[in-house]
Amino acid sequence: TDFMLSELKKGDSVCVMGAPKEANEKYEAFFIEWNKKRVKKGVSLKILYNHDSKEFGKKREKLPLTEVRYMKKELETPAWVDLFHDYVVTLNVHTTPVCFVIKNKETAQSYKEYFNVLWKQAKK
């Protein structure tokens, strides 16, 4: 989101956990523009896509400052989580879009540790 980009500066990173196919289908144009701005700002991205989102992951793999992996099928959910600084942003666009933001250092660190475990298990 624009809020996220406003909080980030060159050298920062974003981790995305569980990017679902449905969200990419609905918001692909937005994600393309957001990623252009992110790359221009010098912000790196590590994204764990749901298993069924490979067509979108293949597009993102070509972007600078971007690493992509895919979660196991049994871990797929309609919601996803964005992690940056002390923020945990959870989104779900399955039916009525829902988004909530937590700003808490300990909570963000817990989610990042979970992300790192999943990242190590995920496939390229």
Regions found by a protein language model. Give the residues of each.
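Interdomain hinge/linker segments and adjacent boundary elements that couple functional modules
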Residues: T1-K26
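PLD/PLD-like phosphodiesterase catalytic module centered on the HKD motif
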Residues: T1, A23-K124
